[in-house]
Amino acid sequence: MAIITKVSAQKRQGRYNIFLDQEYAFSVSEKTLAEFVLLKGQELSPQKINEILDYEASAKASDLAARYLSYQPRTIKEVTDYLSQHEISRSAAKRAVNELTHLGYLDDAAYARLFVKNNLQVGKNGPGAVRRDLKKKGIDDDLIEAALADVTDEEWAGVGKRLVKSLLGQQGKIAKREVDRKMQTKLLSHGFSGSLAQAVTQDLVPEADEDQERAALVKQGLKAYKRFKRYEPGVREQKMRQYLYSHGFSGDEISAFLVGEIIPLEELEEY
């Protein structure tokens, strides 16, 4: 049996050094000190020492996890990974996670609901991206689907509009078809389904306005002419056609510009 010959406070508040038989043995938190009533003169068996150290490891894990949770909500996986990075044993981490879950500080279902709610309010991701993000955070599939279940297409459409509204400024600068394509590409890359992306685009960008389309064709046609005017006529026409097609204009619109129906060809240099 070892005897506690000294208990001294560390400079770090709430930590204590335990000396056994005149030699430093280990340090404990105030919580562990109180739990085992560690006082000078107390005898400790090897089993009791192991019990104290085991409890201390769990207490340390709980304290670390609680501090980590104080900044923002976390998932069970995030807390477990954090404790592992701080060299907390798997068993101590598991006990800490179980304790915090029991106390209600760790709740993956509530986390998933809050994550979805925040995305609907200020985020820019569709259901596919939200699902992927939650999965990366270790949320079980059934909890993810439960959190997504009550979100309507109209709510997702609101998120989608927030994501692509900046592209509305390109109307009148490029073809409506190209505005549509850019919007749908961006929506798909942020986890919106094809049907949702199409619905958002149709709602934001109504049928093409003839004057806007003409203005866009003139703007891009002049850009193409200035870029390629140094080429021979045949090559220049081919390159202009490719350029305008890549900006969403139809073959008929491009041909109309190239034959001078939009702007007389002899006047192009004046712009």
Swiss-Prot record:
Keywords: Cytoplasm. It holds the Pfam family RecX_HTH1. Coiled coil: none annotated. It is found in: Cytoplasm. GO terms for biological process: regulation of DNA repair. Transmembrane segments: none annotated. The keyword Protein transport does not apply. One of its GO terms (cellular component) is cytoplasm. InterPro entries: RecX_HTH_1st (IPR053926), RecX_HTH_2nd (IPR053924), RecX_HTH_3rd (IPR053925), Regulatory_RecX (IPR003783), WH-like_DNA-bd_sf (IPR036388). It comes from the Bacteria. Belongs to the RecX family. Modulates RecA activity. This is Regulatory protein RecX. It comes from Lactobacillus delbrueckii subsp. bulgaricus (strain ATCC BAA-365 / Lb-18). The lineage of its organism: Bacteria, Bacillati, Bacillota, Bacilli, Lactobacillales. The gene is recX.
